[in-house]
Amino acid sequence: MTFILTETSAGYAVLKAKDKKIYKSESILEELSTPELVTSQFKVKGFSKFDSAASALEEVNAIVDGRVSDKLAALLNEFKDEKKSALVVADPKLGNAINKLDLPFDVVAESASLDLFRAIRENLPSLLPGLTEKDLATMSLGLAHSLGRHKLKFSPDKVDTMIVQAIALLDDLDKELNTYAMRIKEWYGWHFPEMAKIVADNIAYARVIKTMGYRSNASETDLSEVLPEEVEAALKVAAEVSMGTEITEFDLENIQCLADQVIDFAEYREQLSNYLNARMAAIAPNLTALVGELVGARLIAHSGSLVNLAKAPASTVQILGAEKALFRALKTKHDTPKYGIIYHASLIGQASGKNKGKIARMLAAKASVSMRYDAFAEEREDVPILGIDNRIKVENRLRQLEGKEIVGTVRPDVNKIEHKKVDLSTGKQYNADADTVGNTTAGADSDDEDSDSEEEVKEKKAKKEKKEKKDKKEKKDKKDKKEKKDKKEKKEKKDKKRKREDDDDEPKKEKKSKK
């Protein structure tokens, strides 16, 4: 007897095959090509329905991990009396797990049986009369989404990609705003140059251009919604005596178009900043409470994701963003940087120059703990308690280093402190005799010191003379050795020369004797 275990999105099904060796057939697809052939070959012997979507997800996770759940074990126990039977399963890991249950099945998990399961899944509505094809498709889609979310641990509120893109766009907007604001000041400055010194804010400058237009309209224009009263008065006075040139209406239209761009960019930047704050509060509330939204977002963007940032040690978080300076310092063997992006946190900005490195190190350590809690905690509180506690600790450490009062410590009760009585009687008088020049003891001490110093000088002088004599003797010995060597070499040369001459004279003497 052959049973086939089939996992569906609705539950577990155990099918009984008419042909005992169907799983060994080489032409399964031909034998099971139509729903009629499938229904004639297989009959449902047992079905265990999933109670809910959550239980379906748990069961599927167990199958993926190769585990036998309680629900599946209960279904298989119904067939424990079936002896000399085979159970065909699709997953070899699940087959090994079923073998450990000591059931009277010969578990079969072969690649050849995949065609069998393909044919069964294509004709499930025919085998399970209570389920339609539409119902199975809907349940399969929902279960697939649930399984995907579970694997990715996906949560729409924790998508840190939004933070990476938002902080990058915020930086781009800042650059564009600065460029446009500088351009509009240079452009409108030809008409009203004094206005740049009076109205320092770029957005207010653009709003004034949009509201006022020509400088000649300043006295008649109400700028109370744009500027403070004293600035408005100064602007109107400067407009009366301005040294700027006149511009045409066409010029003013283009300048006002640029002013509209600056205002729109500023409004969108504010909206984007609020969005970034909300995202950071949802994704990394403890990190935000410790270092702020912008610094936290830049850290996440630099590392790529919150999980990557949480995996980094505190020392890496401390110098994140200063990699170029770090490698240059390592190459030149100079001091490595103490901080990177984290330098812009408000807590480090409050520290004095000598304490910035210490606070940066402590802040990085606390930030590392906070971001790990944000990244890996399954349940979190509405209030970022960990981040606030860590911030208080860093602030207290900063006050301690700066010599200020520490917040949160128990102060002593002033009433319980015992104060010593102050003696207001006459204190010890100054001894004027100690200043006299003729003090004998002082003179004796000074004589002893002088004698000691003279002995030291003599001793040093003797050592110096001894060393000089030794050096002279060594030099003389070297010189004598060199002279002896030179004499010896000269003598050897003379002997060789004389011998050569004697050798040359002998043939001449022989010739003379023959003659």
From Swiss-Prot:
Entry's localization field: Nucleus, Nucleolus
UniProt keyword terms in alphabetical order: Nucleus, Ribonucleoprotein, Ribosome biogenesis, rRNA processing
Cross-referenced Gene3D superfamilies: 1.10.287.4070, Nop domain
GO biological process: box C/D sno(s)RNA 3'-end processing; endonucleolytic cleavage in 5'-ETS of tricistronic rRNA transcript (SSU-rRNA, 5.8S rRNA, LSU-rRNA); endonucleolytic cleavage in ITS1 to separate SSU-rRNA from 5.8S rRNA and LSU-rRNA from tricistronic rRNA transcript (SSU-rRNA, 5.8S rRNA, LSU-rRNA); endonucleolytic cleavage to generate mature 5'-end of SSU-rRNA from (SSU-rRNA, 5.8S rRNA, LSU-rRNA); protein localization to nucleolus; snoRNA guided rRNA 2'-O-methylation
Start-end of Basic residues biased regions: 460-499
Chief location bin: nucleus
Protein name: Nucleolar protein 58
Species in which this protein is naturally found: Yarrowia lipolytica (strain CLIB 122 / E 150)
Lineage: Eukaryota, Fungi, Dikarya, Ascomycota, Saccharomycotina
